[in-house]
A protein has these predicted regions:
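Conserved class I S-adenosyl-L-methionine
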Residues: 1-42, 151
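Class I SAM-dependent methyltransferase SAM/SAH-binding core
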Residues: 47, 53-98
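A conserved beta-strand element that flanks and buttresses the S-adenosyl-L-methionine
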Residues: 113-114
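A short glycine-rich, Lys/Arg-flanked "PGG" loop and its adjoining helix->strand segment in the class I
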Residues: 127-139
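Conserved beta-strand signature within the Rossmann-like core of class I S-adenosyl-L-methionine
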Residues: 140-147
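Acceptor-substrate binding/catalytic loop of class I
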Residues: 157-173
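Conserved S-adenosyl-L-methionine
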Residues: 184-194
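Core SAM-dependent methyltransferase catalytic element
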Residues: 194-213
Length: 213
């Protein structure tokens, strides 16, 4: 079953630039991209899935000389991203619609980033989403992803004046799900994170760097 996430997109449209204000410290995300950059060839094609405002990831990748495509379901976030990172390409797409070939096909990428995007899916959809991301990578390509560590499945949480439905895994379960989707985990990090806004709960963030096997 594919869940309609229109309401999630509308929430992020309304949140807009307040997202970066509420989450100003993104050391874990920046470090995961640094690990990815060490594995990429020059002028690599890199896809940022759930790119949000384009910061910091699309900017970090573009500044390193790579060809960056960002996709997001929120038109409002994409408008900000185009301003923040004018050298990247931004597309209004749902993760589930991404494909290599055919109408709207994106081709394959040397690297994919997917930070806190999978947590917006019910658990039953996450393994399929990971396999889809794998299909978008060249053989031996690299994925950097993050999730919030939590034993949740499509649970409603308050977030910057809105209610979002989110899922999460405990660490060992996340490793298992990622490995079963066809990835070798090559790096891992975690951060305890307290948002600047009191309208977003504290969280424990997990970052994985992976290679398509």
């Amino acid at each position: 079953m594919v869940v309609d996430r229109t309401g999630q997109a509308e929430a992020f449209d309304a949140i807009g630039k307040r997202y970066d204000e509420a989450f100003p410290h993104k050391e874990g995300q920046i470090a995961a991209v640094q690990r990815l950059l060490a594995e990429l060839p020059a002028q690599a094609r890199v896809l940022d899935v759930g790119c949000g405002t384009g910061l910091p990831t699309c900017g970090q990748l573009a500044d390193a000389g790579h060809r960056v495509t960002g996709v997001d379901l929120s038109a409002g976030m994409l408008e900000l991203a185009r301003t923040h990172v004018p050298g990247a390409e931004f597309l209004h797409r749902d993760l589930a619609s991404l494909r290599v070939e055919g109408p709207g096909g994106l081709g394959r990428f040397d690297g994919v980033t997917c930070f806190f995007t999978l947590l917006m899916l019910p658990r039953e959809e996450i393994p399929h989403a990971l396999r889809l991301l794998r299909s978008l990578l060249v053989p031996g390509g690299h994925l950097a992803l993050s999730m919030v560590e939590a034993d949740l499945d499509d649970a409603g949480i308050p977030f910057l004046g809105h209610t979002l439905r989110v899922s999460g895994y405990l660490r060992e379960e996340l490793r298992r799900v990622v490995s079963e989707a066809g990835f070798e985990i090559t790096g891992e990090d975690d951060y305890a994170y307290a948002p600047a806004s009191t309208d977003a709960p504290p969280e424990y963030q997990l970052f994985l760097n992976c290679r398509r096997d």
